Amino acid sequence: MEKIRTAVIGCGKVGHFHAYAYQHCENSQLVACLGRNMEKTEAFAAQYGIRAYTDLEKMVRETGVQAVSICTPHPDHGNIAVRCCELGLHIAVEKPLAASLEDCDAMIAAANEAGVTGTTICQRRFYRPAMRVKKAIDDGKLDKPILGTVNMLGWRDMAYYHSDPWRGTWKGEGGGVLINQAPHQLDLLLWYMGDIAELYGVWDTLNHPELEVDDTAAAIIRFKSGAIGNIVVSNSQNPALFGNVRVHGSNGASVGVQTDGGAMFIAGVSGIAEPPVNDLWTVHGEEDMLERYKAEDRAFFNSIDSIHYFHIRQLEDFLSAIIGKRKPLITFEDGRKTVELITGIYRSCRDDMPVKFPLAPENRGGFDGRLK
């Protein structure tokens, strides 16, 4: 089997997920990692038996790396990705794709110019219940989707925000719950419902007075299809409750996936304690399938390394796309759509009015909450 020479950029908590995944992808040979601090980077490299670098060009020259994962704080994604494209590297970027639409557009343009493959990490698309929802929609089992909802009601204490200096700031993170915890659910909503025509959104910091970013947000969406959407996300429920995405059809049928349970997953801190399952299934003639699907998904979850399995699946798809010269399941353009949705909510709240998509030029600047 052809193997792609891979490397990880960013040697923090999420970088370990990618390094482990690359070492367990059949089509990967992990060769290096890149960080800012050589001592920390060497310690990271020692865990995987790879070479440590602080200079990107030197790493490429000496290792012949072909594909990299970018696992740095969100505002750094754009500049790093553009330089990687210029060096001819294929790129997987941790969610969100970037902290601004400008960075997303620069990344997409650079990848197209260089002819390299890009993906953004949305590993929850590989959940079996999430794929089951998508297939039901594509197979017409809901007739026409007319309503899509996201509820992501989690908890992050201040110890979490203090664990890394970039967390909970506009400069270091580019936002709060919307841009850090909610992108997975927002990606699924867009995957299921399609492009947005217009939205009205609000956000606030309601339960973390030390933060300058959002810990709670909501939005009402009109999709281009004419369907309506609703988003409610928060990091203020203690204990955490759940995250789910649901789609309701014009024939009365409804399907849903619970992506997160009450034991919230924090990368590098906690494991995934509860399996993703279909939490709603009223497809006509299939109403009795819900409990069967739940049982199947729980059994599958208990049979895998749930912390790493879905990163492995997405990175295998990414590398297979490179080898097969095809698009990956999740593209940079998909990642941009999620960032545009998040940006639209921030802009709508700032201006206290609905915003139309695609966002107008004056609405595409990097957002700073102090402008509110």
Name each model feature, range by range.
Residues 1-48:
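N-terminal Rossmann-like dinucleotide-binding module
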Residues 18, 48-110, 310:
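Beta-loop-alpha module in the N-terminal Rossmann-like domain of NAD(P)-dependent dehydrogenases
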Residues 54, 93, 99, 118-120, ...:
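Hydrophobic residues in well-ordered beta-strands that form the structural core
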Residues 106-124, 143-148:
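Rossmann-fold dehydrogenase core element
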Residues 246, 251-329, 355, 360-372:
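C-terminal glycine/acidic-rich active-site capping loop/insertion
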